[in-house]
Amino acid sequence: CRAAVFAYNNEIYVIGGQTDTGVTAKLLKSVYAYNTETRQWQKKADLAEGRTNLAYACSKDKIYVWSKAGTTDQAEIYDIKTDTWETAVLPDTSAVIAAASVDNRVFVLKEDGEKMFWQEYLPEDNLFEDVGTVCPFAASDIYGTPVVISGKIYMAKTEETKEVLVYDAYSDEWSRISDMNLTKKDSMLAASGNDIYSIGGELAGFGVLDTVEQYTVKVQTTTKQMAVNQGESYELQVNAGNLKKGQAKIVTVNVNPEEMKIQNASSFETEDTLKEGADGVTLLKYQPKKGVIVLKLTGSLERGGSYETYQSIPVEAKITGKTTVEITLTEEKIMMWGFVR
């Protein structure tokens, strides 16, 4: 139990864990992979020592693993392709309480006293980015394995709670979705498509639950391929559709920075102007080196009740061939949890 479990291509990996929940439980260092096509288990390279209740994230064929017991200055890295482990000595010593992968980027949830914040880890440089915004809603605690949908990290405490916190890895903002129907502990979050599931748990005065709650995230992701020529400029058209006055959508644009360069935040306005907001467009995040731009598009004019809101982003091709552009639209709308029958 309490192993790290994740899916990679057609395999499910199980790393570490412990033999039971008792005080005499033995820590496990074993690693196994289950192939969903052959329905066979395969033994993989062991951890250096037994580990349980790990924080972990997957990025570019590698798994990054942190101990959640006390502070650490190390991360263990598993190479899926070569079936080997290595240890990286980190640039600082910190208390890691969770980790998540967002579009092949590694984020680590750290605590400092009662404060907690997400921080991006750059494996190629073995460096941490600047500290993210401190969570304004809750103090540091023990959290279950987070789930990710369209650049947002969803997390819930293992102790009694009905609250689910959300961290937007692109805009560096915290929020909360509507509360779950049941106040429970040890419930597990899982994600599939645009749906979040809260599975099982324990309810005070009732016992172990066999219920599943479901929450649907209002998000639309479009992935398209562009044929480009190295050195040529192009315009990425971002269309939020017809928005009524005051209605808003968050638009996240992702390109491969090795294949395409974002030249400016907009073809119409300067970066500073967009940060303040102009003609219904506000720049929330601009990271051209990572191929990321986040905009908030708000309906600001009336034209028969609604009008089409769009933005144009200038880019330059760094390759000749095909490259992929991902555009995600998230609507600022409150949804409710429901029970899965």
Q: Where are the language model's segments positioned?
A:
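Kelch-like beta-propeller repeat domains
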Residues: 1-220
